[in-house]
Amino acid sequence: MENTRMTIHMCYLTILLLLALLAPPCTPVSDTDDGSNSAGVDGSHRARAEATVADILSAHNEARRKVGVEPLKWSQGIARYAKDYARSRRADCAPRRSSLFYFGENIEVGKGRRWGAGALVAQWVDEGRWYDYGSSSCSAPAGSSGCGRYTQVVWRNTTQLGCGKIVCDSGDTLLVCDYFPPGNYGTGRPY
């Protein structure tokens, strides 16, 4: 009788061990994240995260190249901060600046979940059409975002960038990019 109980217990333990080994991870990868904090994610999600980072850097550095400014480098630490802040806005998806003024910051909301990060950054770069370098002024129409997001993208003293992209509860896409050192300070020109 004792031998039979021991055999049954061993069978149960073996089955539990097999189930644990075959079960999916406890924290599945969500389609609401871009993967910029990619520890422990599957290969396809990591590839999407790397493509998102490449799109963001490419869009920024192309705008910087056009005005003769050095390219930005990606910072994982800054990206973690940006991602955490973006996640804190998941419920309202509001493009409000974070309280940490140590970084420069650009925020964009795209209607719907399929916005690519490069397309969101392009909205900031597009503000450059209203920026006049000669007078260091902005002629953006009333009600627009102005030129401040563009000037942050091309600010010559900024060297590092980190961003976080999420899909909000509303289904819209929120992109937060933080910059170090911050731009848009003083009365100087961005480049």
Regions from the PLM with identified roles:
Residues 1-16:
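Classical eukaryotic N-terminal signal peptides for Sec-dependent ER targeting/secretion
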Residues 17-35, 39-42:
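N-terminal signal peptide
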Residues 95-121:
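A solvent-exposed, acidic/Ser-Thr-rich amphipathic alpha-helical stretch
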Residues 72, 107, 153:
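Short clusters of hydrophobic/aromatic residues that line enzyme substrate/ligand-binding pockets
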Residues 41-104:
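Short, well-ordered surface patches within globular domains
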Residues 29-31, 111-191:
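Disulfide-stabilized extracellular recognition modules
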